[in-house]
Amino acid sequence: MTTQAIAGSCLCGAVKFAVTPPFAAFRYCHCSRCQKATGAAHAANAFLPAAQFKWLAGESLTKRFNLPGAKRFAVAFCTQCGTRVPHKTGENMLIPAGLLDRDPGARPENSIFWKYKAAWYVPPQDMPKFDELG
């Protein structure tokens, strides 16, 4: 795993940040809230101490949504393009791993809330693979 800073950004590039591994955790979350928040079968989130995170641009363009009634669920997004962006959770920053501009060297350690996985989810090792669409 690298310990050099890794840049990341949202889809439109207005929100930019850097993280310095190692991560405290890196996991897939299959809970119904993460499915709704991502529009996918699971979230891929890395966590690291806030001291290992730095906003480079666009922090003022982020908006946080705290789910009413939830003790620990929130999402943040870029107000220009809607991409989920990092946010503070406890003492750590939650980093949607797909925002990182290069391989962090770490791999997800586990899948949590597996019993709630989407009924249509097929683990990747069980699917045909193609390098590009069509």
At which residue positions do the language-model features occur?
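A short Gly-Trp-Pro
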Residues: 1-134
